[in-house]
């Protein structure tokens, strides 16, 4: 299986990533194709679709062996579920699936046509294995149930972002950052209100702590 593209986002590490695609639609990414796959003809007709499926590789989660059970973050990291009942990266084949919004096909200076997308849950440089259109007729299932994952649907925290710190963030990046923080990036099993967490975003290091349902940004620095 070949890598056909890589996505470039403002998140250089796993920490801070949305837990699923579509949760932070404001988070943009650019899918840049490998030289072999930069044929404009390969994208003919793609503008007619509002959303795409990205099939990608968990490049940071490769292991020599696999376990039939994993600890889903949504269950606090303490309860085991079958690997095929989860979207854990620790799988026999480390392949991920994300539904993203197609914001446009753009022409780059030296890398051919690229796809501008919104709502990706991928770190910068993630390898893309395939791209397919989202088909509402086939892919939307209104009667579907979400198992244990439905228990945490809609969870968010209130974000306190002091104005003097927010000013350090480029204006075009603020909305997505606040939306990311509202998703509470902490591991689900950590709830120490005094602990300081941090993650990289758009060339910045953002540090925060969480108490109850309130997240407070305490530092923003250039990396």
Residue ranges of predicted features:
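Mixed-charge, low-complexity intrinsically disordered regions
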Residues: 1-95, 107-116, 120-223
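Conserved positions in beta-strands of structured domains
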Residues: 8, 100-103
């Amino acid at each position: 299986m070949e890598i056909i593209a890589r996505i470039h986002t403002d998140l250089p590490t796993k920490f801070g990533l949305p837990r699923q695609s579509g949760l932070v639609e404001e988070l943009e990414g650019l899918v840049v194709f490998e030289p072999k796959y930069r044929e404009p003809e390969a994208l003919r007709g793609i503008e007619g679709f509002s959303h795409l499926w990205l099939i990608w590789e968990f490049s940071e989660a490769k292991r020599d062996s696999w376990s039939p059970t994993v600890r889903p973050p949504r269950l606090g990291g303490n309860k085991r579920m079958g690997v095929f009942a989860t979207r854990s990266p620790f799988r026999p084949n480390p392949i991920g699936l994300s539904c993203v919004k197609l914001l446009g096909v753009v022409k780059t200076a030296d890398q051919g046509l690229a796809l501008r997308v919104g709502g990706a849950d991928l770190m910068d440089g993630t390898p893309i294995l395939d791209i397919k259109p989202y088909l509402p007729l086939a892919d939307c299932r209104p009667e579907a149930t979400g198992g244990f994952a439905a228990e945490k649907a809609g969870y968010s925290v209130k974000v306190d972002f002091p104005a003097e710190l927010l000013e350090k963030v480029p204006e075009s990046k603020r909305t997505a950052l606040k939306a990311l923080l509202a998703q509470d990036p902490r591991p689900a099993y950590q709830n120490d209100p005094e602990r300081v967490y941090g993650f990289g975003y758009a060339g910045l290091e953002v540090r925060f702590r969480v108490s109850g349902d309130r997240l407070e940004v305490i530092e923003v620095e250039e990396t």
